[in-house]
């Protein structure tokens, strides 16, 4: 090490002494954590060989932007160029990086890559292939890329004519070739500035202001800023994971932090997932609605702000790595020598395509096993095998289908992963329970948390996964080479370095050993943001690591759904008590300004929540670490990791944690490193959960190669859908989020589950659902009734609640039991159609669940702000009840060229289209309608399990449009074989008084077709024939419904089927 000059020694020692004075008063677990940061700063200063340091200015108005240097290097698929600072460094929140490289690559006709990175490549970038593969930055190396002539999108910049144009620094913008409309524009002159911060954000200090006083591009070692102009009232969707009052982001006032956090489901904050992707819908200059997607590839914490006319990115690391997706479909798939003609001749642009193009880039979602679309049941608080078995038995006794039983952390011995409690879940009884489930064609899923208990250091305790992890050297470390220790449910814990050489081997061994004692069908991955209950390293030099007491959760829960007053009506949650309705009376504003009959106000007496995330302490009990450092940079290689100068709004509205522990709260310390001393956790924190999912997916493929892995996980990053499904986290037994400031005291309710499902279609994770009836707080009968109905028409269906809350299994209330039977039976009946949508979306990347305007852009203005209704696939319109004490709802039904049909009664909906209308919605019902011109493939006899249901013959429900036509394709496979999966496509079409079907592919359908229901048959046929033979039928004049029965038709035909195999001739009477 270069020696310190005498002149600089005194101030450096004084700074160190001051730091030690403040830290030595703290436990060793905190001061070691902080001392490492300050020593690192001193070391970097010394290496610079100078006493001169750089202090942040906290002022972006001084930032000069960049200028183009030299001539771009052109190639067939794009170009590269060099950028350098256009003036004196501003060092706003770090050290300005003087030299940057611009890479512009036309990767595909619809996909444009723009990457601005430090030429020295010192900034962290996601290694290619770590989660998903992607083209590189050098256009000369691109294989099978597109060209500027072929591209849907045009890249412009202010120096493209050889000289800098306009005022300010270098900037770029992206335009559509077909219309000339600009979709991304970084020119500061086109972007409004805001000198005041957002009114909704209480803290607007120099370190985290939400003001936007300037828009020059900033590229520093710990702060990157870039802005783009937006139209007034921009229609932005995505940028999550988030909970707010609308699927559409507020274009005038949105602050969205990005940093994976164990936080429940907070309103207007960051939470479990990290997805800096948005889809935007705009009216072009020609008045047409077009949609595109914009993705920023990064791993660092960041804030994204929306204010009127602008979107601004603020990242605390990484690079500016954008991809733009046009949302356009080419006129044909054939190649053309005239690429320009091909690009202009686009025939369609759609949100489905804009989302699909992004999902194709990060990797299409996995096809999940068929059984996973059954009903799942869980709660935190099934304390032993007997309680769990009693619930399984009660479900069957009440004839409520149960496909998958889950256990939360209750089954673990002292909350240690890969163990079972010998008293409460003894292996013999536990194995017998699971075996009985398997014998009945049911399934079992246990939870696994990310934190691994520290291997005991005494001779009386053994924890093999911890010991084996030490042997294979897979656990995250401190900078000094010691193991990093956190605290979670088991006490002292390690965390796996997911990129360690032996990480995959360790996970596979642990999962394989666990599978020999617990015969699970899938795994539930939790706490993998990752979550830790301490700030910093929990173990100091003298900590006794054998003392690992497990945490004890509280057991009392207060809080009820809006309008239910437990002080008046008790804790039953019933709709009626002694003949009286239990909702208190009182007017509350609806979304449309009208008054509803019963109050949505909540009595908040003793509103104490039991959460999976407990209060966070500093190591050994201290709450917070030292105050902010006096930021002094020696050079751009030095960083302040736990407490960078720009404080992203991590956990905003959740707690009043001081900014100096902003990033370390509730997670692994940012200074922790990989097993090789590389990869500061600051850079890889947001990847951790998805890398764990990848390890689990690969392990399950290895352990059970003939089965599809099934994972449900909490923390996600782009590409996670290739490995896992997701549930929307620890939500609340609420109808919707609470009003005003009250919203920040709780979180997502039932209404937000729709927003969440739609979000994750954009994020490429299609198996998605919420905790039905709510996780936090006590639920009640009416909320649970409505939620079970809604949950049956979302991809992932699981009822789950917290320890200490009243029980909410479907059999607990008679009306909920009845609603559950109705909803689950219908789900199982139409499961071939739902599964087809999920499988086809996995193959194509298009969303399985869609906002109405995705399919019907003519209703965009009416539906762009809300998600009160949604489409499952392109054919099932779901309109749930999302408020209490109503028997009617307002809903909008697009004009689809025929009659929408209720899938329960087959009755035609007779309403005015493209307007909000009133429809009946009695308790224990839900409005689900089949689109005209579409077909449902069904199981004819829904049963208790998915397996039993699938043994029954197929049926078809054909809803003719006004032209007497219908068409749909269905995906058939065995529901279990991993990809590449032998499958077939069944195509059903109707027209000219006939219904025809054809099947193509490798998979042979296991069941015959037994009935066909044709809707909108206005006259009674004289005969119905199939294959030249008359068939049985009945006709309902009121419903205009033809029911053809007794078919027993082989969908496969003889051998490999080609052509038409089913034909029903409808010879109608005059």
Swiss-Prot record:
Q: Which reaction does it catalyse?
A: Hydrolysis of terminal, non-reducing (1->4)-linked alpha-D-glucose residues with release of alpha-D-glucose
Q: Kindly give the CDD domains that the UniProt entry links to this protein.
A: GH31_MGAM_SI_GAA, GH31_N
Instruction: Please give the PROSITE patterns that the UniProt record associates with this protein.
Output: GLYCOSYL_HYDROL_F31_1, GLYCOSYL_HYDROL_F31_2
Quote the InterPro entries the UniProt record gives: Gal_mutarotase_sf_dom, Glyco_hydro_31_AS, Glyco_hydro_31_C, Glyco_hydro_31_CS, Glyco_hydro_31_TIM, Glyco_hydro_b, Glycoside_hydrolase_SF
Set out the biological process GO terms recorded for this chain's protein: carbohydrate metabolic process
In terms of superkingdom, the source organism counts as: Eukaryota
Q: What does this protein do?
A: Hydrolyzes a broad range of alpha-D-linked glucopyranosides, including maltose (alpha-1,4), sucrose (alpha-1,2), isomaltose (alpha-1,6) and turanose (alpha-1,3).
Q: What is this protein called?
A: Alpha-glucosidase
- Organism listed in the record: Candida tsukubaensis
């Amino acid at each position: 090490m270069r020696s310190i000059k005498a002149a600089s020694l005194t101030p450096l020692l004084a700074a160190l002494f001051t730091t030690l004075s403040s830290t030595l008063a703290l436990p060793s677990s905190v001061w070691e954590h902080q001392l490492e940061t300050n020593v690192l700063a001193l070391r970097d200063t010394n290496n610079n060989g100078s006493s001169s340091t750089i202090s942040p200015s906290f002022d972006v108005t001084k930032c000069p932007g960049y200028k183009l240097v030299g001539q771009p290097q052109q190639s067939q698929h794009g170009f590269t160029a060099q950028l350098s600072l256009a003036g004196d460094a501003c060092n706003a929140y770090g050290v300005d990086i003087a030299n940057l490289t611009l890479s512009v690559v036309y990767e595909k006709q619809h996909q444009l890559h723009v990457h601005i990175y430090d030429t020295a490549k010192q900034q962290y970038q996601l290694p290619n292939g770590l989660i998903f593969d992607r083209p590189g930055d050098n256009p000369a190396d691109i294989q099978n890329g597109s060209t500027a002539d072929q591209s849907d999108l045009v890249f412009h910049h202010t120096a493209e004519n050889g000289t800098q144009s306009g005022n300010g620094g270098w900037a770029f913008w992206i335009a559509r070739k077909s219309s000339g409309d600009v979709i991304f524009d970084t020119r500061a002159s086109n972007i409004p500035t805001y000198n005041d911060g957002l009114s909704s954000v209480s803290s607007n200090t120099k370190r985290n202001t939400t003001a936007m006083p300037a828009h020059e591009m900033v590229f520093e070692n710990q702060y990157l800023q870039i802005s783009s102009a937006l139209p007034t009232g921009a229609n932005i969707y995505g940028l999550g994971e988030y909970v707010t009052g609308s699927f559409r982001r507020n274009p005038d006032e949105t602050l969205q932090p990005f940093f994976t956090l164990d936080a429940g489901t907070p309103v207007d904050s960051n939470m479990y997932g990290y997805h800096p992707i948005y889809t935007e819908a705009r009216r072009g200059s020609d008045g047409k609605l077009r949609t595109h997607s914009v993705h920023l590839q990064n791993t660092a914490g960041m804030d994204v702000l929306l204010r009127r006319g602008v979107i601004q990115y603020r990242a605390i690391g990484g690079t500016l790595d954008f991809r733009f997706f046009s949302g356009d479909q080419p006129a044909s798939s054939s190649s053309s020598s005239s690429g320009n003609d091909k690009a202009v001749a686009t025939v369609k642009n759609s949100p489905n395509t804009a989302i699909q193009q992004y999902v194709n880039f990060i990797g299409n979602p996995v096809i999940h096993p068929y059984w996973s679309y059954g009903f799942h049941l869980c709660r935190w608080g099934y304390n032993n095998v007997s309680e769990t078995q009693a619930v399984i038995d009660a479900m069957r006794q009440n004839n409520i289908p149960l496909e998958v039983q889950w256990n939360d952390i209750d089954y673990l011995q002292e909350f240690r992963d890969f163990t079972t409690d010998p008293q409460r879940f003894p292996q013999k009884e536990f194995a017998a329970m699971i075996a009985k489930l398997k014998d009945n064609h049911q399934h079992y899923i246990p939870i696994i948390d990310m934190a691994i208990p520290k291997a005991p250091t005494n001779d009386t305790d053994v924890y093999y996964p911890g010991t084996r992890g030490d042997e294979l050297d897979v656990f995250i470390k401190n900078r000094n080479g010691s193991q990093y220790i956190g605290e979670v449910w088991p006490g002292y814990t390690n965390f796996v370095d997911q990129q360690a050489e032996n990480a995959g081997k360790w996970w596979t061994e642990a999962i394989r050993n666990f599978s020999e004692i617990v015969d699970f069908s899938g795994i539930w991955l939790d706490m993998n943001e990752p979550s830790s209950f301490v700030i910093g390293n929990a173990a100091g030099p003298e900590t006794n690591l054998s003392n690992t007491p497990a945490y004890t959760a509280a057991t009392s829960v207060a809080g009820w759904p809006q309008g239910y007053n437990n002080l008046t009506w008790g804790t039953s949650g019933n709709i009626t008590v002694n003949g009286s309705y239990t909702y208190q009376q009182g007017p509350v504003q609806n979304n449309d300004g009208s008054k509803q009959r019963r109050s949505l106000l909540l009595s908040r007496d003793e509103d104490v929540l039991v959460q999976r995330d407990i209060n966070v302490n500093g190591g050994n009990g201290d709450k917070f670490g030292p105050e902010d450092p006096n930021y002094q940079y020696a050079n751009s290689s030095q960083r302040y990791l736990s407490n960078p100068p720009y404080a992203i709004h991590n956990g905003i509205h959740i707690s009043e944690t001081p900014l100096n522990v902003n990033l370390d709260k509730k997670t692994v310390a940012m200074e922790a490193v990989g097993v090789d001393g590389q990869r500061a956790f600051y850079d890889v924190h947001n990847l951790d959960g998805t890398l764990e999912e990848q390890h689990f997916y690969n392990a399950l493929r290895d352990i059970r190669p003939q089965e599809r892995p099934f994972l449900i996980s909490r923390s996600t990053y782009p590409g996670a859908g290739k490995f896992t499904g997701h549930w929307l986290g620890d939500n609340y037994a609420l109808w919707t989020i609470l009003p005003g400031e009250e919203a920040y005291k709780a979180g997502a309710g039932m209404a937000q589950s729709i927003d969440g499902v739609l979000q994750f279609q954009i994020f490429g994770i299609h198996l998605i659902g919420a905790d039905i009836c709510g996780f936090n707080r006590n639920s009640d009968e009416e909320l649970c009734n409505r939620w079970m109905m809604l949950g049956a028409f979302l991809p992932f269906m699981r009822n789950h609640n917290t320890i200490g809350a009243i029980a909410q299994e479907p059999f607990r209330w008679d009306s909920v039991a009845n609603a559950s039977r109705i909803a689950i039976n219908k789900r199982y009946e139409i499961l071939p159609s739902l599964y087809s949508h999920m499988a086809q979306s996995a193959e194509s990347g298009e969303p399985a669940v869609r906002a109405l305007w995705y399919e019907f852009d003519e209703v965009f203005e009416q539906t762009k702000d809300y998600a009160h209704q949604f489409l499952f696939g392109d054919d099932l319109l779901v309109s749930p009840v999302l408020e209490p004490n109503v028997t009617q709802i307002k809903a909008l039904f697009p004009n689809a060229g025929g009659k929408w049909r209720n899938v329960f009664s087959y009755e035609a909906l007779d309403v005015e289209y493209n307007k909000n209308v009133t429809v009946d919605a009695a308790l224990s019902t839900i409005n689900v309608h089949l689109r005209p011109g579409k077909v449902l493939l069904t199981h004819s006899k829904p049963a208790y399990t998915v397996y039993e249901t699938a043994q029954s013959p197929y049926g078809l429900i054909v809803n003719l449009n006004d032209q007497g036509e219908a068409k749909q394709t269905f995906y058939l496979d065995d529901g279990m074989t991993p990809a590449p999966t032998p499958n077939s496509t069944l195509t059903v079409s109707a027209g000219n008084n006939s219904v025809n079907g054809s099947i193509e592919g490798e998979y042979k359908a296991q069941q015959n077709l037994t009935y066909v229901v044709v809707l909108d048959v206005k006259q009674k046929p004289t005969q119905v024939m199939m294959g030249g033979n008359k068939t049985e039928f009945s006709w309902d004049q009121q419903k205009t419904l033809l029911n053809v029965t007794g078919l027993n038709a082989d969908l496969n035909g003889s051998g490999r089927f080609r052509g038409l195999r089913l034909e029903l001739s409808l010879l109608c009477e005059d």
